[in-house]
Amino acid sequence: DSNLAEFQQWLSENEVYVFTMNGFPYGNFHNERVKDDVHTPDWTTKERLTYTRRMFDQLAALLPEGNTGGISTSPVSYKYWHATEEATKTAFETGAKNMLEVAMHLHKIEQETGKYLHLDIEPEPDGMLENSDEVLQFFADYLLPIGVALIGEKLGLDAEAAKKLIHRYLTVCYDICHFSLAYEEPTDTFEKLEKAGIAIGKIQVSAALKILSNPSGNDEIWEALALFDEPTYLHQVTEKVSGKVKTYNDLPIVLEHKREFEELRAHFHVPIFLERFGALNSTQDHILKVMKYLKEHPVSEHLEIETYTWDVLPSALKRDLSESIIREIDWFVDKF
């Protein structure tokens, strides 16, 4: 409590405020091997529930009056931890119940403080939710039916009121990098979610690596891509094959085989101000599409620039951390 009060004072003195948090990582997220442990503890555990509720209590204390707040979180769990159909179903059910406990906690916070906070579920490659179709299915098959029963029992609400509560407090975190890896066009995704009544709590402004095949040979491309192979984070690679997205669960798999391709996209958050670096490109075009859409359709009021890989970038892209962050913000403000 004293730390929180101290932090509040510092925020006030520096004329800044907190309206969003990244609740996906748990514990240290830098300078050590993370890989699939980024999902630990997942939503099948009480640890994840307790951690998230505690973060929301802190956000409720920090959030200035008149603002809304949100916390992004993992897409239930890591897909490959649940080997059978039954195990996957159980993980979705348990994860949904724990997220619904958070939704009821947020309902209580709003009743007591007047502050509206939402949990923003963040799909990502190899997560149990990777794309908008899987989000829709999670709501339809798990959150809504389980939630109607659970909220009805605990809060005495009828089915319609329970569904409204779920849609109010459980939203999507639209990470631009992640949805570009799913080869989804922003307009299509936004319209699909809106039609299903699913809100976008937060948009994370981020870019993935885009690798376009060179007709005269890819040696330079493979050499450039190898510089992004580092041991801290998972860097899934996706490819669109016959209309479907194929995922390789880490960069070394692609680098080892070096087979022919037209376009690959890699889960490596690169500086948003770079469209191209040497033989490689970025999905910066997706950021520009999202920004254009937002000007006409304000689907979310929370935007968070989310490049977290500064420590592991190839040396040619590394700059002073503060300067890099300022450059990203300046680029974004200039374009938006």
Regions inferred by a protein language model and the residue ranges of each:
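Aromatic-lined glycan-binding groove of carbohydrate-active enzymes
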Residues: T189-I272
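Acidic (Asp/Glu)-rich catalytic clusters
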Residues: S2-F24, L59-G66, M104-G114, F139-L144, ...
